[in-house]
Amino acid sequence: MELSMFGREDTNSSQWGEVHGPFMLEEIVCQAQNMLTSRGIFMKSNPLKYALPLLLLQMSVIIVTSRLIFRVLQPLKQGMISAQVLTGVVLGPSFLGHNVIYMNMFLPAGGKIIIQTLSNVGFVIHLFLLGLKIDGSIIRKAGSKAILIGTASYAFPFSLGNLTIMFISKTMGLPSDVISCTSSAISLSSMTSFPVTTTVLAELNILNSELGRLATHCSMVCEVCSWFVALAFNLYTRDRTMTSLYALSMIIGLLLVIYFVFRPIIVWLTQRKTKSMDKKDVVPFFPVLLLLSIASLSGEAMGVHAAFGAFWLGVSLPDGPPLGTELAAKLEMFASNLFLPCFIAISGLQTNFFEITESHEHHVVMIEIILLITYGCKFLGTAAASAYCQTQIGDALCLAFLMCCQGIIEVYTTIVWKDAQVVDTECFNLVIITILFVTGISRFLVVYLYDPSKRYKSKSKRTILNTRQHNLQLRLLLGLYNVENVPSMVNLLEATYPTRFNPISFFTLHLVELKGRAHALLTPHHQMNKLDPNTAQSTHIVNAFQRFEQKYQGALMAQHFTAAAPYSSINNDICTLALDKKATLIVIPFHKQYAIDGTVGQVNGPIRTINLNVLDAAPCSVAIFIDRGETEGRRSVLMTNTWQNVAMLFIGGKDDAEALALCMRMAEKPDLNVTMIHFRHKSALQDEDYSDMSEYNLISDFKSYAANKGKIHYVEEIVRDGVETTQVISSLGDAYDMVLVGRDHDLESSVLYGLTDWSECPELGVIGDMLTSPDFHFSVLVVHQQQGDDLLAMDDSYKLPNVEHQKIGDTGIQQRFSAEEGFTTIDLGKR
């Protein structure tokens, strides 16, 4: 057949047209040779008639359009997947594709084949990464609650949806092909994919919330249910022939080879590289790509999609660092950000709204009604099972909406079914549209209904001031990102002067950014996987604090945790642990790290966001620690110089009172010099009317301390405005090792006049922001008192007995830890 029969220009890189196939009309594409790159417009050569320029144009238009649509949909909390599908819809036959000239220029048949091939390669790699981030053991950690909800989330829609088909087919009569397509669509609508759910949770910043952890486990259970049903259906409908049995055994053999051959090879190569001296590349990148290609090719040879082998190869490998982290960093950039948008957009390009309207309206309406009924049954089944498990009604509704969210796995399955003619074009269009509609509404409602910060609002007062007034145990939660944070945190603990009569409980939380795994982690240190590189750093942190504990035996009680979550939501773990352990004060590092010469060495924007989120939602008081200790190398706790001089800058307000309460505890340490600098305006010298009597009592107590102890000093600075206040603070120089200050002050105070107009770091307050200047070389602790009603109930669970009459050397004194200490592990698997 000559190309001229197709009615196209012979200068195109490809020619196409319809020919008679064995069963129906099919489209054939003839690709011209030597039409890869254009000679240029100056040589009168149209670049769009050549393969490479056309491919680059297609990718550019798809990526730019998807980003624009995503930006438009952002206020509605829609995901990138929805934006990419809508990109295909806009660029496809539903809208712009009605223009024949545009379609022949932008998406000719030959150009479509090339971009489909490349995008499928990107999708195979992306699915491998999704599998790599899955921890197979998570299904074993799912408690009975997650198993019940996950099973109900699949069983209700699958069974009731098929019953609806049976009822409608008997009462109204539906053709057999419509029944077959709709049954397949029901099985797809009933499933909830674990990778999709974790992606949605991460995008909504609730992956490590209580609801997020429950949804993670439920989605895994639901997906396993869909696997079993699909396997049973496949075995039931498959022809009972030796060929079918041979094909099934080959697929099982591929899975066994992946797990028992490919996996050990990759793990062995990774361990070998990790132990080598070359730390630049700890992952066998090219061997992994080779085995990935073999697994994908084997899947295609056995009659399944190439992504099947890639996905299960990823599942078989250990998630998290080093393998998962390194591979994700190298592959996600071009696979997930470049080729994947093209793959999803092509699914939208295959969607044609006009084919739906032009087809039989009765069948279209029936299919859509059945699909909506299926999603409704999924929602009701999940909500009912959640309510049965005594989940709060708001959380049950949000969980039901989350289980209705679908994404790339479902879109991919629909495309495969369309190519295999399991569903027709009409059903394919309806499924894609319904997924967009249901997922879009569900995501928006979850954002509107669920606020994880409400869970962290404590019903009792947990402040340092309250601890001091009612003789309660001081309980600290220390957030750390690396071992460099340890020495100054140890200095802070030592400055608070733990004794057997006034002990301290503290909890360390190693904060790790989630990379290379899909689900968040909050676990005690002793339960961490020893093969995880984060365990090694956590062990260094724990060992340092354990040395410190040995120094204060009987006066300290500690527990050590590690949290791995996206930085955008890791504040949920901080607040969860603080609430669970009834912490009095959360101490978190400042987002700027200072070099040894005092200048700013590194600025970490995500850590600043964490600090702001913790300040807004914390169930207790919060302190941001500006560390100006030695930052050269990994400091040893044994070599750290303890603080000798501490100052407190007092202006007025609740936060200053909170900082003063902590300062007064430090003043009890015999070998620590403590100075309180009280800023007062000249007009207030004769006015002793304080906004809070507790503030007045604190100052009076400190003055009494200063009168009786030589190492405690009270200094009153008389200033007229903010300029003189700044001059006094600037004169501190290097006289102190650490300075305490409240975050918020009495803004009506004249001593701040002129200072409140500008602030670079509002999370530190006016004075705290001033102390971040490189002119100062001491560490700073900015304290913010617990927010909420002053009438909060007092929690005396950790009340200390009155031992003022006891002597320090009395060995008969019992340890002053509450019998209800509750130093137990957090079982996150049974949510």
Curated annotation (Swiss-Prot):
Induction: Transiently induced by K(+) depletion. High-affinity potassium transporter that plays a role in K(+) acquisition. May operate as a K(+)/H(+) symporter. Preferentially expressed in pollen before and after germination. Detected in pollen grains within anthers of the flower buds or in pollen on fully open flowers and on the stigma, and in pollen tubes growing in the style. Weakly expressed in roots. It is found in: Cell membrane. The keyword Transmembrane applies. Belongs to the monovalent cation:proton antiporter 2 (CPA2) transporter (TC 2.A.37) family. CHX (TC 2.A.37.4) subfamily. Coiled coil: none annotated. It is a multi-pass membrane protein. This is Cation/H(+) symporter 13. It comes from Arabidopsis thaliana (Mouse-ear cress). K(+) uptake enhanced by a proton electrochemical gradient (acidic outside). Not affected by specific inhibitors of voltage-gated K(+) channels. Disruption phenotype: No visible phenotype under standard growth conditions, but growth inhibition and leaf chlorosis and bleaching under low K(+) conditions.
